[in-house]
């Protein structure tokens, strides 16, 4: 956008859907009991420990496990990002609900903005994205929503290299949605 004050900013609404394994399949896998994957016995502890392996986390480098404490913010997308080298995961602690916006991986430099989808997680299950899945950081529905975020440290370094409201690197493309589209994308919550 060129900063012309005569431009009318468009508003595009995205309906929020329940996070189900079927609805999320194009973007990744649910982590938790809601994954639909049957647990197996660990082989120890007389059957008292069952293990479920809903996804294989992929990262070939130093990986960061961090805790994000999220506060409610306007239900408008500011950025959309993707990672090229790892499968990022969000794992809630404390059972508080949150919303995540996803876009399918694309070959080009931007997502298909007309196909973005928003999903409400109830706080009992997490999510691990496919490599290249476009997403915005979770929106909390309650104060102090704690979410474990698993991603490569290279991504953290890429995020520090902001340029014009965006960040780019070998494992990251983080785009400013308003600059790219001239529109505000808002969630129908």
Q: What does each model-identified segment do?
A:
Residues 117, 125, 143-146:
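A short pocket-lining beta-strand/turn micro-motif at the edge of beta-sheets
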Residues 88-91, 126-127, 138:
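His/acidic/aromatic-lined binding-pocket segments of jelly-roll/cupin-type domains
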Residues 120-134:
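Conserved metal-binding segment of the jelly-roll/cupin
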Residues 2-118, 156-189:
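Non-catalytic, conserved peripheral segments adjacent to functional cores
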